[in-house]
Amino acid sequence: MTKVRVKVKVKVKVSELMQYVICPRLVYFRVRAQGRGYESYAHTHTQAQAHTVTAREKSMIESFILKEFAFNLHKITGCEDTAAITAIIGDIVESVPRIYREELEGLGLVLELDLIEAVKRDFIQGMNDEWLKKLMTENELTELERVHGYERERMMYSEKLNLSGSVDKLIIADEEVIPCMIKTGKSPGYGVWRSDRVQLAAYAMLIEDEFGSIVKRGFVEYIREAEFRVTQIRRSDRAEALQILKQVRRIKQGAFPDKGRNAPCENCVYSKYCDTDTRKTLLSKLLGK
Ligand code: SF4
């Protein structure tokens, strides 16, 4: 009797497409993390640093605050009272330990009152007039948000693509559905980064499957610089997102990928395993296994 092989379509998250863009091997190691001890290494690594707040952890806390700023823009835009803005900043900083509890615990951090105060002080001292002025001035995105509101971290799933993801903000402006992403890194001189275009294209395809409408544009908020950029969702971005989706599926099914061209190996928790696995793969190839 002939055996019928049922092809199981591997589920993929948009965040895994972004890991692939940084380095394809991150997808490989993160997928295998639970079963093979990689995760316990990463955990021990953060536990060992738990007693002090390192510069890297401080910058992560700052990223959480910036992200919350982006979610609270409607309170800041148009506000001219500096005392009110200081109070809003206080509220945002104080909400961070509750909203990002899982992430902070992952870092081995508990944001005690003293630390929150210190973070708040540093943050307020680090703000500059130009940045605040840009946040307080209405732009195309904040106008859309004022008129239509937005849904925070909307989770979407496409059965056709077997792809899921949650976009930071989803604006439904009458017939148009617009994805919006918050980024805490630097902005490019013009437009949006290639990886951000690919991520927006992936969200666009999820939205199209869920809402049945074509997504033509998306926004990226580079909140650290108060830069709000709109970008068209191009055919080439969609094609690249689909191509990466295919590669991520292969990796999740066991393929060991090459390193990314600009892989950030010096800060990677998997560097120890990465070389071991490379050797093992080469050896396996030589032995024909
Ligand atoms: S060590 Fe380098 S190549 Fe290996 S997973 Fe990390 S970033 Fe990628």
Please report, for each region that a protein language model flagged, where it lies by residue.
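Short helix-capping/linker segments at secondary-structure and domain boundaries
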Residues: 30-39, 208-214, 276-280
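Mg2+/Mn2+-dependent nuclease catalytic core
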Residues: 141-246
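Metal-dependent nuclease catalytic cores that hydrolyze phosphodiester bonds in DNA/RNA
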Residues: 1-172, 286-289
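Short, intrinsically disordered, charge-biased short linear motifs at domain edges
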Residues: 1, 8-11, 247-262
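Short, surface-exposed, charge-dense and proline/glycine-enriched linear segments
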Residues: 211-213, 241-254, 284-289
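Cysteine-cluster motifs in flexible loop/terminal segments that predominantly coordinate metals
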Residues: 15-29, 253-289
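Noncatalytic linker/hinge segments flanking ATPase motor cores
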Residues: 71-75, 209-211, 219-225, 257-265, ...
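Residue-level signal for alpha-helical context at structural boundaries
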Residues: 35-38, 221, 236, 259, ...
